């Protein structure tokens, strides 16, 4: 392909045979008073066959600095070859050749030709023209470290003391007559190589001197990123960001993500020139934004839910779907469940989901679909339906606490967009800021700031997962292939993101709002009867929402919810009814209740002075989780109720006691081996049992009607001598901890 481009001596001969053009004067030759950097004499010419997001990004940067841009090729078929993988690009020269006929005789006209899909302008026309005139060239090409496409030509390049040695055709600037004189010689195929064409002209010493051709060796104007990523850093001003080349201490005007540096350009484009600034924040978050009108029905959405592994708190996730702030008659639900374990949870919620959404489809584990196949099926159902305007993919480990999430993402008006979600208190999130060479996770310089929302905006990232919205039209026109997730051996989300990136579609991430969080699923053990109980470490926020009483925080804040039925005996809400029920069910499922005898092999000494029928938390593997509950919730309440006392919340004895009239109905008077004791009622008096309660003998005071989920907190040894009152009917359960023994 490249061999059809003629030798440089033949090109020189052809150029010498051309009719003479009006002389082109350099800045130093111009009469005094002439303006060598008049922006009105500058035209930026670029090439684009389609209005991709990269092209729009280029135009946004041009508009920010008030450049005049002329685009060649819009709407036309690209015949220039697969330039991302091999040689080609000659079609650009053919288009430019035709366009330059208009400017052939305009001596003061300066043309800058650049690519568009992978280019960002970083400074003003005035700075650009000033630097060009200072170069003393009539035609200045960008430079890079690689002699592409023919390494055999490297020795013919002039030696360079400092800077990049080789020509890159992705950007050049020059006087119009000079550029016209060069491109006029193009008589080759569209898929011949444009860079080889320009290279062979430049390598002829006579031609180089005659036409004053040169390279931007130190990236004063053009910064090609390929081979130079270590040289480039962001330079933050208050209202503007640009890049700095630290190798040459220059501030390039044009940033070109040539070769395999498209993702790095996307990262830089999040900031340059005004994507995000320290003072102004996000500069284009509201660009092209749409507002869903209140009086009209919003777009139709396919909500695709994926339960691909055992997932904590799934019933709460399913109920949260009903709370989306979006008309349910405009949402169709697709739900793929890959876990037999979760079938009862989905069966319980399915009638509500059926009644709520306009249409529903359930694909269960019996279909034996892989995660990728299920995702392909769901996405294609939107793709094939012209009425499907948006596709909302949501994994079961994504906790959307903001009911307006769907509406917010649609109004952002991007082809693909995800809400930023992360695990509570951790840096694990649903996006990657960069990719490693093998396309796995790499941490971008701004990753922590984005996850912690120290920088808030709209970000172009290489990978998203677990929750995202895609335009239906984008699926139908730009992602028409059915197998997007299952097209390779990689993770389905990685395959999807690669497919989107390869199409030139940006993966946007918004952290402008608090959308929710991610669940950790790696330690979810479904061998337990109620595995959610064990999630206090991995998913503490969701655990609290499910298991800590809704009024606990108010009680801790002193809002009058703590009662004192007896001296120094405090009564406050601690656990939800669900936790009480699940604790009891776990104990009964385990079933190995002690016999209420003094001999007890579970204790170090083998003897219990005041025996009860009980099961220790250690026996069911819940000791660590219960101690964490004591540290997190009981400790702060204790220090609030007993000022001046600091608890270490150590507890060796943590157990559930069962009282029955025919088993052990009561407990004789005793002191507890603790500094203070926690006693939580786990079921309802009058419903589950009759009788019961606790009497403090020294004060002749009793708590005879314990409330389910409420905790009694009282001193243990010395002062609060107490007994368990008889249970006369049913079964009474309490949870007891002897704290700080």
UniProtKB/Swiss-Prot annotation:
Name of the protein in its database record: Multifunctional procollagen lysine hydroxylase and glycosyltransferase LH3
SMART domains associated with the record: P4Hc
Pfam families noted in UniProt: 2OG-FeII_Oxy, GT_PLOD, OGFOD2-like
Keyword vocabulary terms for this entry: Dioxygenase, Disulfide bond, Endoplasmic reticulum, Glycoprotein, Glycosyltransferase, Iron, Manganese, Membrane, Metal-binding, Multifunctional enzyme, Oxidoreductase, Secreted, Signal, Transferase, Vitamin C
Residues at which 2-oxoglutarate binds: 602, 659, 679, 732
Function: Multifunctional enzyme that catalyzes a series of post-translational modifications on Lys residues in procollagen. Plays a redundant role in catalyzing the formation of hydroxylysine residues in -Xaa-Lys-Gly- sequences in collagens. Plays a redundant role in catalyzing the transfer of galactose onto hydroxylysine groups, giving rise to galactosyl 5-hydroxylysine. Has an essential role by catalyzing the subsequent transfer of glucose moieties, giving rise to 1,2-glucosylgalactosyl-5-hydroxylysine residues.
Start and end residues of each stretch annotated as Important for dimerization: 675-718
Residues covered by region (Accessory region): 298-523
Cofactor: Fe(2+); L-ascorbate; Mn(2+)
Gene3D superfamilies hit by this protein: q2cbj1_9rhob like domain
Subunit and interaction comment: Homodimer.
Single Gene Ontology BP annotation: vasodilation
Record-listed Fe cation binding positions: 670, 672, 722
EC number: 1.14.11.4, 2.4.1.50, 2.4.1.66
Compartments where located: Rough endoplasmic reticulum; Endoplasmic reticulum lumen; Endoplasmic reticulum membrane; Secreted
Organism: Rattus norvegicus
Topological type in the membrane: Peripheral membrane protein
Glycosylation (residues): 66, 551
GO MF term set: iron ion binding; L-ascorbic acid binding; metal ion binding; procollagen galactosyltransferase activity; procollagen glucosyltransferase activity; procollagen-lysine 5-dioxygenase activity; small molecule binding
Disulfide-linked positions: 282-285, 382-388, 566-701
Domain remark in the UniProt entry: The N-terminal domain mediates glycosyltransferase activity.
Residues covered by the Fe2OG dioxygenase domain: 650-741
Binding, UDP: 47-49, 115-117, 259-262
Organism domain of life: Eukaryota
Summary of the tissues where the protein is detected: Detected in heart and bone.
Cellular compartments per GO CC: collagen-containing extracellular matrix; endoplasmic reticulum; endoplasmic reticulum lumen; endoplasmic reticulum membrane; extracellular space; Golgi apparatus; rough endoplasmic reticulum; trans-Golgi network
InterPro entries with a match to the protein in the record: Collagen_mod_GT25, IPNS-like_FE2OG_OXY, Nucleotide-diphossugar_trans, Oxoglu/Fe-dep_dioxygenase_dom, Pro_4_hyd_alph, Procol_lys_dOase
